[in-house]
Amino acid sequence: MWWVIFAIGAALSWGFYGPILGKGQALLQNPMKALLCVGAAYFLMGVLVPLGALGPSGLTKFTQSGVVNATLGGALGALGAIFIIYAFKNGGVPAYVMPLVFGGAPVINVLYSMWMHPPKGDINPLLWVGMALVPVGAGLVLYYKPS
């Protein structure tokens, strides 16, 4: 059940990510300075924490396919941060950008996962209903957000 706590932690972290990054970008008056700060945070959290957690014995037995896939996943995460910064730079605000990002991401995740691991049986039609409701939900969040 720990996974639920960690998933909630990720939701909280990413929920605050957009508004705080947007504020930092505005205060720095340069999106590339904000991206540099994101990169520094990624380094601190994404390199130093695992090094400490793995310890000297954990730095062995890396597989090529594991390294390639994990690095590609990390690069996609960093690319997502770059796209968010450019969305802000080009007039998007966190209250609009983040619902689009976090509404679209689960749909892409499920479609990609189904492509990589085709379902063994029939797909429940409610999956497609849920996917159709994502843009409706994002639209409602965007339209009715407090001003």
Placement of each model-derived feature along the sequence:
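Polytopic alpha-helical membrane proteins, predominantly small-molecule transporters/carriers
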Residues: 1-147
